[in-house]
């Protein structure tokens, strides 16, 4: 099958940008079109096969004709409308941002970042952090040829689970700050299941920023560590951290935005596991693009949790021609997140995230009065277990009612740890290959509220394609004249 014909876009370029493009052509030996379109395709996550033609100096004309995939042209047009500017200006800005400063991928690999490890920092040493740290230890010797529950691949794009190395951690409670990460993960109020011993990591938990990270009820059972907030940016730089995971409590809106600023200043990638919307927001997408670093977000999915199960059931109704009339999902748990969510104003973004994730699989709009998805109550004896009750009421052939109910019981934090292990390795692949901004495919597969919602099968295919196109080691063949 022939590839779709490329579309032509005539771009008016300032002299300084043409000079930068000429320098890149000389440096890489690639054609001007391959350089420029390659940058645009990388920025907007569109597949692009370079021509391999040798580079030529750009001509004296003030305009350059770019030949690009139709999908890229469509994405540029859509983003231009979104940002209220024309396509020409968007192309010039994107190329200038990338060529006007040293790309992060170059500094990642050559100056301060290690290509052989995925260096990870954690914000919030709670149950999820505990399960993640245990999981990396538990699967460090896993056979890449064997199936491991909860992981896309033991070896993902050239990175094994054991290639994940923890470099820094931040928390605000006296029980955790100042302790080795391997000890802090067992401290109060953490109460998730233990499935692996963890040796000393050599990573001391630093005093982080509180802001709105501790809610009213959680503040009654933990004590804030004394002292000033440690130098987050300096620590991330000194430890050569690649990726920062946001594990702050639900409702930490201001704290998440503050940490996001520190992550950008440090030049790190981000995996936003919380339902504070960063990756899906245009403003933050642009900030990560400008910084030259990737982000996966927002709000981590579980391996098999209440929301993914709810999505599948709603999809079955859709695919089998049953009209979904109303539905609910009620969640109960005994961890600190459920305690935090006793404050109803802290769970607004969580409720929006879970609701949108379910509604996105339907081809029609379900009124807000007919869908309720969200945390319901805190039950201390459940500890880190979560119970979810799901009900769907629909109309089938002959306008006959069809109803379905399901109960699911999980250990909440281990249920998402494998997903995060995949997420940090995917962001590392993006860093290595100079891909910046929100990673659309991986975010859709791994997160409840991504920038773009795809159905689960399509999202996985996009993520697998991302891995194939951005492996750890790439050998570039010499272009033939």
Kindly give the residue locations of the regions a language model identified:
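Short Lys/Arg-rich basic patches
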Residues: 1-13, 46-68, 77
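Short, basic amphipathic alpha-helical segments that act as recognition/interaction helices
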Residues: 30-52, 85-107
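N-terminal glycine-/serine-/threonine-rich beta1-alpha1-beta2 phosphate-ribose binding loop
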Residues: 106-259, 347-352, 388, 397
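Rossmann-fold dehydrogenase core element
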Residues: 287-300, 321, 325
